[in-house]
C-alpha cells in the first residue's frame, strides 16, 4: 500500500489516529461543550429532571435517562489530588512530560473531581495540593467529509489545567494581563 493512502496532517500524525473529538455541530451532540471552551468556560451537563450533574457532558442523564439536560459552568481552578507523569513512551502527538491529574474542583462544584491533563509544567515539579487553573488550547483541524456537500474544516479546541504560579496569581488578582 502506498503512503499516499494514509491521510497525513502536516506530517505530524495520521488523521486516522486523531485523538481529538470532532467538534462540529453536524457530528457531535455535545458541541455546546466545545463552544463554551472556545469562550474559556469549562462546562458539563445537569439533568433538569433529576438534578444530576455528570462529567463528561452527556446527551442522556445517566441517573434517570432523561434527555432534558442543560449546560452548567464548572470552576476554572482546582487542586491536585493525585497525578502521574509519563516521561518515556509518550503517545504520538504528545511530548514529555505527559502529566495527568485528578483534581478537586471544590465542595461547591457540581462535579467534585475531574481527571485532566496538566500542561506547562516541567517534570518533577507538580505536587499533591498544588493549585491548577484551566487552559484552553487549539488542536489540529482536518477536513471532515459531509457526503455530497463537500468537506468542512472545523476549528477545534480542548482543555487542560496548568499550575497557578505566584506570578500568574498576581496577574489575575490585579487584572494585569500580558499582551502578545
Mark where each language-model region is.
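Short, cysteine/histidine-rich loop/knuckle motifs that typically chelate Zn2+
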Residues: 46-49, 60-66
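Short functional micro-motifs and their immediate structural scaffolds
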Residues: 55, 68-70
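OB-fold (S1/OB) nucleic-acid-binding surfaces
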Residues: 92-113
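A broadly conserved sequence feature marking short terminus-proximal activation segments
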Residues: 1-42, 145-154, 158-167
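Short metal-coordination and nucleic-acid-contact micro-motifs, chiefly zinc-binding Cys/His arrays
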Residues: 40-43, 57, 74-76
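Conserved hydrophobic positions within beta-strands
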Residues: 78-81, 118
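Short, conserved beta-turn/loop elements at beta-strand boundaries and strand-helix junctions
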Residues: 83-89, 108, 123, 139
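Well-ordered alpha/beta subsegment
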Residues: 113-180
Amino acid at each position: 500500500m502506498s503512503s499516499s493512502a494514509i491521510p497525513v496532517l502536516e506530517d505530524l500524525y495520521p488523521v486516522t489516529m486523531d485523538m481529538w473529538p470532532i467538534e462540529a455541530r453536524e457530528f457531535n451532540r455535545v458541541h455546546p461543550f466545545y463552544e463554551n471552551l472556545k469562550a474559556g468556560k469549562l462546562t458539563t451537563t445537569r439533568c433538569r429532571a433529576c438534578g444530576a450533574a455528570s462529567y463528561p457532558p452527556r446527551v442522556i442523564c445517566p441517573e434517570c435517562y432523561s434527555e432534558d439536560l442543560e449546560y452548567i459552568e464548572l470552576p476554572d481552578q482546582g487542586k491536585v489530588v493525585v497525578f502521574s507523569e509519563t516521561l518515556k513512551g509518550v503517545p504520538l502527538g504528545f511530548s514529555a512530560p505527559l502529566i495527568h491529574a485528578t483534581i478537586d474542583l471544590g465542595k461547591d462544584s457540581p462535579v467534585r473531581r475531574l481527571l485532566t491533563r496538566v500542561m506547562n509544567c516541567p517534570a518533577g515539579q507538580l505536587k499533591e495540593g498544588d493549585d491548577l487553573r484551566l487552559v484552553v488550547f487549539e488542536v489540529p483541524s482536518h477536513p471532515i467529509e459531509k457526503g455530497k456537500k463537500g468537506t468542512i474544516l472545523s476549528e477545534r479546541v480542548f482543555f487542560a489545567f496548568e499550575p497557578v504560579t505566584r506570578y500568574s496569581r498576581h496577574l489575575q488578582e490585579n487584572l494585569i494581563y500580558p499582551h502578545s
